[in-house]
């Protein structure tokens, strides 16, 4: 019995000792994990500190411009500060790219060319490129089938299949003018063709080009076309072209003369690029009557596409496109709505859908019914009558 008790006591002591060691092991494992995490954090902090020290100790570099090569090893460069230097070139730099006018990075101490830089781009031109045309399909443009076909023939076909024009023996159009009343879809057409072609898209608001300093506006036009040539295929869309493309006259202020200089630079650039080069121009205006004849002549703007007010069938197509995403209840008689929308443009038809939705919200509904559309078109018809009958005479505003 004594031996049994002794055996039980030893076993109990062994189990207790095992549990104690197990707890100690788990505690040590936890400490090791914590130490490893602290080590990772310390290494990260160390690397960050090393990078900061390198940044503080590093020497800046100079931007210069290649004037001309002297021989295979040396070039004449002009530093941004003004002086000219005869410098060497780093072995890893491709010397064929170092042509006259190339921007380069020079070492601060030895003035060795470290690498070539891309052409400097004006921030205004850079922002033009980052205008997103959106994801617009041709099916989202209603009632303009003929105009879409003509625009695609003038812009898309020369960019995608230039060999067709070579085989036939004709020169493709350089540019297209879209003209028509406001709200008929000129800008929408340009966005649709830009989003359906794998090409760069520069959207230019013509009034934003005009600068108060003489020569700056013409320089922007030059930079815009240079950038387009370097990033072919490219479509340049100039909205409200009447801001700079108005008819020239001999008299006027200095501001008028600056606008005329800008127009002359635009005319020169339109004549300058290759017919089969992949740079195409689309211009839009609702005042074609004020444009300069030199801008409108074939060879610059080869096609003039009128974007008219939609007829009854076109209004039906446009209204259905805008109403497609609206939550509706019951049957909608689009023919009755379209008959009341005589003289409406595409923007007005979109506004009908917006107003119908507002009537539904006012009635505390989350869907639109036919009566909402009828109320909306009647309301906007009254507004259109007011808009068309607003004639002001010389006595307006006088007591």
Curated annotation (Swiss-Prot):
The lineage of its organism: Eukaryota, Viridiplantae, Streptophyta, Embryophyta, Tracheophyta. GO terms for cellular component: cytoplasm; nucleus; plant-type cell wall; proteasome complex. The gene is RPT4A. This is 26S proteasome regulatory subunit 10B homolog A. SUPFAM superfamilies: P-loop containing nucleoside triphosphate hydrolases (SSF52540). Component of the 19S regulatory particle (RP/PA700) base subcomplex of the 26S proteasome. The 26S proteasome is composed of a core protease (CP), known as the 20S proteasome, capped at one or both ends by the 19S regulatory particle (RP/PA700). The RP/PA700 complex is composed of at least 17 different subunits in two subcomplexes, the base and the lid, which form the portions proximal and distal to the 20S proteolytic core, respectively. Keywords: Acetylation, ATP-binding, Cytoplasm, Isopeptide bond, Nucleotide-binding, Nucleus, Proteasome, Ubl conjugation. The modification N-acetylthreonine is found at residue 2. Signal peptide: none annotated.
């Amino acid at each position: 019995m004594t031996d049994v008790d002794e055996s039980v006591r030893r076993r109990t002591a062994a189990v207790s000792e095992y549990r104690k060691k197990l707890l100690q092991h788990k505690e040590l494992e936890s400490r090791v994990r914590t130490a490893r995490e602290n080590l990772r954090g310390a290494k990260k902090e160390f690397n960050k500190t090393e990078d900061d020290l390198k940044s503080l100790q590093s020497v800046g570099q100079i931007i210069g411009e290649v004037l001309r090569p002297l021989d295979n090893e040396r070039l004449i460069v002009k530093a941004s500060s003004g002086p000219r230097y005869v410098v060497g070139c780093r072995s890893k730099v491709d010397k064929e790219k170092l042509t006259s006018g190339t921007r380069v990075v020079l070492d601060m101490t030895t003035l060795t060319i470290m690498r070539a830089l891309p052409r400097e781009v004006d921030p205004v031109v850079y922002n033009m490129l980052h205008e997103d045309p959106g994801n617009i399909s041709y099916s989202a443009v209603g009632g303009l089938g003929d105009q879409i076909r003509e625009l695609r023939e003038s812009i898309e076909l020369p960019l995608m299949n230039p060999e067709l024009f070579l085989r036939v023996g004709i020169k493709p159009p350089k540019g297209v003018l879209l003209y028509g009343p406001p709200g008929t879809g000129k800008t929408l057409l340009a966005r649709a063709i830009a989003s359906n072609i794998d090409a760069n898209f520069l959207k230019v608001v013509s009034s934003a080009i005009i600068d108060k300093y003489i020569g700056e506006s013409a320089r922007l036009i030059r930079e815009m076309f240079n950038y387009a040539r370097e990033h072919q295929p490219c479509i340049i869309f100039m909205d409200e072209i009447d801001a700079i493309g108005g008819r020239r006259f001999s008299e006027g202020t200095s501001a008028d003369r600056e606008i005329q200089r800008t127009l002359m630079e635009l005319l020169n650039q339109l004549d300058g690029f290759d017919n089969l080069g992949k740079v195409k121009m689309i211009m839009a205006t609702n005042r074609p009557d004020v444009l300069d004849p030199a801008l409108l002549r074939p060879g610059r703007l080869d096609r003039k596409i009128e974007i008219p007010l939609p007829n009854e069938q076109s209004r039906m197509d446009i209204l259905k496109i805008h109403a497609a995403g609206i939550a509706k209840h019951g049957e909608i008689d689009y023919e009755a709505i379209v008959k009341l929308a005589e003289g409406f443009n595409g923007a007005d038809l979109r506004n009908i859908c917006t107003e119908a939705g507002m009537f539904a919200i006012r009635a505390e509904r989350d869907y639109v019914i036919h009566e909402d559309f009828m109320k909306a078109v009647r309301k906007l018809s009254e507004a259109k009558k007011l808009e068309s009958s607003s004639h002001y005479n010389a006595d307006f505003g006088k007591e």
